[in-house]
Amino acid sequence: MAQVVADPIVDKSAILKSELSKQPETLIAYAKWYGKVAGPITGVDLSAIDAKSLTLICTLSDGSKQQVRIELSPPLARYEDAKPRLLEMKTRALEGLGLTKTPVITNFIFPSLALKTTIWSVAGLLYLTFVPNPYLTGANIPRAWAAVGLIHGPQAIYTATLARKHVGNLTTGVSYVLGTLVFGFPFWIDLRQRITAARVESVAKIQ
């Protein structure tokens, strides 16, 4: 018989509901952006929250009520993930509604994660490419580079979409895209983390 995993949020949902009830602008932003509630909203109550969704009760200008269920994707794995996720959702909603500026990254920083991971495999491949090795056939190296391109290519495209929206100059954007093309995931992960940090900072300034 399959074991039922307990929801990590339900037992502490009262804490989250209490904190969010003090942020009416956040709940309205959720309702407008994620819930697609049309028309003026005079108030929003958070009626429920769990690992998979939050439920809002919106009071419209004519006095009527509208219930909105907003899915959390992916679901929250633990309670400690709730506040960062809700804050990120708030920043995205405020950006989408035009109430705050989209975060812009203006400088390039070589990701420390790359120094611990993919840089060594790429360096090894470069060495084998230019230094003859009697144990490798001529076809193996091109195949290895083709595999790198096949794996890193889609990641570079994803990085380009992030850079197009969130990077403020061509040099920085190209650096992240080329870095991803050569070294892979450490570059797009670093860029996404910097964007998230910039979002949090922008919200902190308007709270």
Curated annotation (Swiss-Prot):
The chain crosses the membrane at residues 108-128, 169-189. It is a multi-pass membrane protein. It comes from the Eukaryota. It holds the Pfam family DUF2470. GO terms for cellular component: membrane. Keywords: Membrane, Transmembrane, Transmembrane helix. Induction: Induced in strobilurin-producing conditions (on CGC medium after 6 days of growth). Its main location: membrane. The keyword Transmembrane applies. The keyword Cytoplasm does not apply. The structure of strobilurin A was used for the development of the major class of beta-methoxyacrylate agricultural fungicides since its beta-methoxyacrylate toxophore targets the Qo site of complex III of the mitochondrial electron transport chain and prevents adenosine triphosphate synthesis. Compounds such as azoxystrobin (Syngenta) and Kresoxim methyl (BASF) are among the most widely used fungicides worldwide. This class of antifungals are used as effective treatments against a broad range of destructive fungal plant pathogens and make significant contributions to food security. It is found in: Membrane. Pathway: Mycotoxin biosynthesis. Part of the gene cluster that mediates the biosynthesis of strobilurin A, an antifungal polyketide that contains a key beta-methoxyacrylate toxophore that targets the complex III of the mitochondrial electron transport chain. Strobilurin biosynthesis begins with construction of benzoyl CoA by step-wise elimination of ammonia from phenylalanine by the phenylalanine ammonia-lyase str11, oxygenation by str8 and retro-Claisen reaction to form benzoic acid, which is activated to its CoA thiolester benzoyl CoA by the dedicated CoA ligase str10. This is Strobilurin A biosynthesis cluster protein r1. The gene is str1.
